[in-house]
C-alpha cells in the first residue's frame, strides 16, 4: 500500500509538471500573439480619407475664408455627408464652390458647359470652371484665403478633374492663395501608356504624364508643383496635402459614388482607360445605354454578335454616338479585367474594319490628344502588335517611374513593374 501511495504521488507530481509546462508554453504563445496584435490591427485598420480627418481639416481652415473645388464625389464615406455640409456644420466660413466638368452635382453630360448657380441647401454660390473659364479669376479669388480640392479621380490622364486641379493650382500661385488637397485613393492605380509629348497639350493632357499615372491627386499635385509644370507663373503654389490613413498603393478601392455620369460602376472605371480611345472613332462605347464603357459596337454585324442600341438617356447621355442605331460588338460587363491599360479591344476592332480602316479614325487629331502623341495612331495603322507598341513606351515610362518615386506619400506597390 505504501508503494502504491508513492506511485500515486509521483504520478500527481508528473501531471503537475506537465500542466505547468503547458501553461508556460501557452503564456509564451500569448505574449508573442499580443506583441504582434498592434501590427495586425494597423494593417487591417479602415481607410480614412483626407476629408475624413476633420480635426486636421478644420484646424487648417479655422478663421479663413474658404473656396471649395468639389463635386458629387466629395463625400465623407463613414458619415455619408458632403464635404460642403460637413464644413458648414463645423462653422468653417465657406464663401464659394468651384465646380469641374459635369458640375457640382455631377449630372452634366461630357463636354456640357455648366452655368453658375447657388447650392439650394446652403445658398453658397457655385462657379463653373469648366468651359470657357477653366480656372478661377483673380476677382473670384479676391475674398478667399484658401482653396480646398476634394474630388475623386480615376487615375487616367485624360480624365479632366486633374486638369481642373492643375489650373486651380496655377490660379492660386498667381494670386498667392493657399491650396489644400484632401487626398483620396486612385482606383486605377497603375503606371502605363505613352507619355504626353510636347505639342499635344490639351485639357485631356495638361501635364506630361502617361495615360495611367499611378498617383493619388495629392501626390500628383506635389509633382506638378515641384516639377515646375505651372506654366502661367514661375512661382509654385502654397500647397498642403491632408493625407489618407491606412492606405498604400495597390490597395483595391471601390468608389461609393460614381465619379461622372458615364462611369456608373467599378467595371466601367477599370475599362475606361482602354476604351476611351474609341471616342475618337465611330465605334460606340455604350453612351446612351445603362452600361457605358462596358460595351463596344458599330452598326455592322462584322464587329460581333452582341447588340445594343444607344438612345437619349437623361443622366447618362442625351445625344450619344450612333443614336437609335443597332450596334454590333462585344459585351464587357462580366469581362474579368483587373485593370490597367490594354490595346487588345482597339486593335481587334481596327483589324475587323478591313477595307474601312482608312475611315476608322473619324477624329484623328482627337485620338492623338487622348494618346498624347501621334505615334500610337501611326503604329496601329502600320500593323504593329500590342507587344511592339508597348516596347516603344518603355524608355520614357522608366524615366517617369523614377520621377514618380520622389512624390509618393504612401508605400508603393510590391514591385515597380505593376501595370
Pin down the residues of each PLM region:
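Conserved functional hotspot residues or short segments at active or partner-binding sites
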Residues: 292, 296-394, 419
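Glycine-rich oxoanion-binding loops at beta->alpha junctions
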Residues: 115-144
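Active-site loops and adjacent core secondary-structure elements that bind or stabilize anionic groups
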Residues: 10-11, 279-289, 296-301
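Glycine-rich, charge-decorated loop segments at or immediately adjacent to ligand/cofactor-binding or catalytic sites
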Residues: 106-111, 180-201
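Sec-dependent N-terminal signal peptides
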Residues: 26-36
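Glycine/threonine-rich flexible loop motifs
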Residues: 153-165
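Conserved anion/nucleotide-ligand pocket segment
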Residues: 201-274
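Single conserved hydrophobic/aromatic residue that forms the stacking wall/gate
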Residues: 1-14
Amino acid at each position: 500500500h505504501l508503494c502504491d501511495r508513492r506511485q500515486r504521488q509521483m504520478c500527481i507530481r508528473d501531471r503537475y509538471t506537465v500542466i505547468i509546462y503547458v501553461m508556460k508554453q501557452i503564456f509564451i504563445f500569448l505574449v508573442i500573439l499580443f506583441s504582434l496584435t498592434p501590427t495586425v490591427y494597423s494593417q487591417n485598420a479602415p481607410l480614412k480619407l483626407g476629408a475624413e480627418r476633420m480635426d486636421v481639416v478644420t484646424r487648417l481652415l479655422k478663421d479663413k475664408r474658404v473656396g471649395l473645388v468639389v463635386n458629387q464625389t466629395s463625400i465623407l464615406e463613414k458619415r455619408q455627408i458632403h464635404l460642403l455640409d460637413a464644413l458648414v456644420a463645423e462653422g468653417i466660413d465657406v464663401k464659394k464652390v468651384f465646380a469641374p466638368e459635369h458640375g457640382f452635382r455631377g449630372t452634366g453630360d461630357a463636354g456640357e458647359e455648366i452655368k453658375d448657380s447657388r447650392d439650394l441647401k446652403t445658398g453658397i454660390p457655385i462657379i463653373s470652371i469648366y468651359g470657357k473659364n477653366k480656372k478661377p479669376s483673380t476677382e473670384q479669388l479676391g475674398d478667399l484665403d484658401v482653396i480646398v480640392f476634394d474630388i475623386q479621380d480615376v487615375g487616367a490622364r485624360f480624365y479632366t478633374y486633374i486638369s481642373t486641379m492643375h489650373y486651380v493650382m496655377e490660379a492660386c500661385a498667381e494670386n498667392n492663395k493657399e491650396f489644400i488637397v484632401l487626398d483620396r485613393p486612385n482606383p486605377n492605380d497603375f503606371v502605363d501608356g505613352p507619355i504626353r509629348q510636347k505639342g499635344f497639350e490639351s485639357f485631356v493632357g495638361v501635364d506630361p504624364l502617361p495615360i495611367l499615372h499611378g498617383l493619388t491627386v495629392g501626390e500628383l499635385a506635389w509633382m506638378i508643383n515641384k516639377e515646375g509644370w505651372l506654366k502661367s507663373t514661375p512661382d509654385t503654389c502654397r500647397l498642403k496635402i491632408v493625407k489618407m490613413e491606412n492606405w498604400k498603393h495597390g490597395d483595391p478601392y471601390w468608389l461609393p459614388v460614381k465619379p461622372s455620369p458615364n462611369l456608373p460602376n467599378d467595371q466601367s472605371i477599370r475599362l475606361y482607360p482602354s476604351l476611351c480611345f474609341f471616342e475618337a472613332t465611330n465605334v460606340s462605347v455604350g453612351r446612351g445605354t445603362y452600361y457605358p464603357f462596358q460595351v463596344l459596337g458599330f452598326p455592322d454585324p462584322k464587329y460581333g454578335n452582341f447588340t445594343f442600341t444607344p438612345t437619349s438617356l437623361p443622366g447618362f447621355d442625351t445625344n450619344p454616338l450612333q443614336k437609335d442605331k443597332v450596334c454590333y460588338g462585344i459585351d464587357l460587363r462580366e469581362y474579368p479585367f483587373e485593370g490597367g491599360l490594354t490595346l487588345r479591344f482597339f486593335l481587334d476592332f481596327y483589324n475587323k474594319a478591313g477595307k474601312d480602316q482608312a475611315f476608322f479614325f473619324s477624329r484623328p487629331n482627337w485620338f492623338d490628344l487622348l494618346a498624347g502623341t501621334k505615334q500610337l495612331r501611326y503604329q496601329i495603322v502600320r500593323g504593329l502588335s500590342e507587344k511592339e507598341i508597348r516596347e516603344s513606351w518603355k524608355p520614357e515610362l522608366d524615366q517617369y517611374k523614377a520621377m514618380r518615386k520622389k512624390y509618393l506619400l504612401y508605400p508603393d506597390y510590391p514591385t515597380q513593374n505593376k501595370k
